[in-house]
């Protein structure tokens, strides 16, 4: 699926909203602020609409979860932001993600670290995600 100027604009707006709205506790304020900016830059690079069914394309950049098959969902962007900030990842880190799902979280993580290893137990979700992941630089 193409990443159009419309999608990029919606993604930029979503990131601005996430930066302003999402509060994260568990790390000191300065670290949280810095990590939020880093993670939001990574989120802005990943075309979320490519990781969901085209039926949801118009809603891809809302802070909502969407079904991806086999009873699984793609997490809402605020959840991806909070989880990733709290992981406190750094360049050169290696990440093991259990439960690949759509592959969106792994793509965000890959923008921040050297290597992401991810496994998925649902065969259909896994096959679809492998194709998406490869198509988008994973």
Q: Can you say where each PLM-predicted feature lies in the sequence?
A:
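Conserved alpha-helix/loop element of class I SAM-dependent methyltransferases that forms part
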Residues: 20, 24-25, 62-64, 74-93
């Amino acid at each position: 699926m193409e990443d159009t100027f419309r999608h990029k604009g919606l993604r930029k707006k979503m990131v601005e909203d996430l930066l302003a709205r999402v509060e994260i506790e568990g790390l000191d304020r300065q670290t949280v602020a810095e990590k939020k900016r880093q993670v939001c830059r990574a989120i802005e690079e990943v075309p979320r609409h490519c990781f969901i069914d085209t039926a949801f394309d118009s809603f891809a950049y809302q802070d909502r979860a969407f079904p991806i098959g086999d009873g699984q969902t793609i997490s809402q962007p605020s959840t991806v932001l909070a989880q990733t900030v709290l992981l406190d990842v750094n360049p050169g880190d290696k990440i093991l993600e259990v439960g690949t799902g759509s592959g969106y979280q792994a793509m965000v993580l890959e923008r921040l670290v050297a290597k992401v290893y991810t496994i998925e137990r649902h065969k259909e979700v896994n096959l679809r995600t492998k194709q998406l992941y490869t198509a988008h630089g994973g």
